[in-house]
Amino acid sequence: MPTKLPIPIEFRLPESWLPARPEGFDAVGVAFAAVHPRPDAGFAANITIDGEEPPASVTLADLANEPVERLRDVAESVEMAHRREVGSVDAPALTQRLAFTSVVDGTRRDLVQSQVYLSLSDIEDPHRHAVIRLVLTATAAQHDAVLGDFQDFVRTVRPDTETEA
């Protein structure tokens, strides 16, 4: 069952990506998932969205460390290949790329995750902040081919300006 995000967002999926049911070890807390229509050797690249309202004292780097530790519990040779703080003072963000080996459906796979952490303010209550995490997971062989789609997707994510009645 998908989890509700702490603040509503809107986004546009890349062309041909398909909404999917969140599954797997890291699906707890996932609000939305999508899969690439062309799997690589049986593994479908996927995009997931989750989020939380962290205490003010928690940094984006603190939040980004958590999935690294979770991956180390279930995967082999987890390596942080890249981490960079981006955005502005008013809208900070953090990107990181993780490479790891994991057994998925009985097959050992070299996977790469590109993660983006966006700090967003609630449109209706600007004092309320949430961090939205966007994650692309793909095989090492397919990652670079789908990364552009993920980057295009990230550019469409913003707080939802239409309120529910």
Regions found by a protein language model. Name each.
Residues 1-69:
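Secretory pathway targeting signatures of secreted, lumenal, and periplasmic proteins
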Residues 15-17, 130-165:
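Surface-exposed amphipathic alpha-helical segments
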Residues 19, 83-85, 159:
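Hydrophobic/anchoring residues in structured secondary elements
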Residues 34, 49, 96-98, 117, ...:
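Short beta-strand element of the conserved SAM-dependent methyltransferase core
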Residues 43-48, 92-95, 127-135:
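Glycine-rich, often proline-containing surface loops adjacent to acidic residues and nearby aromatics
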Residues 52, 99-103, 137-139, 160:
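Solvent-exposed residues in well-ordered beta-strands and their adjoining turns
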Residues 55-58, 105, 141-145:
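A generic structural signal for short coil/turn motifs at secondary-structure boundaries
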Residues 62-125, 151, 164-165:
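Signature of long, low-cysteine stretches enriched in small and polar/charged residues
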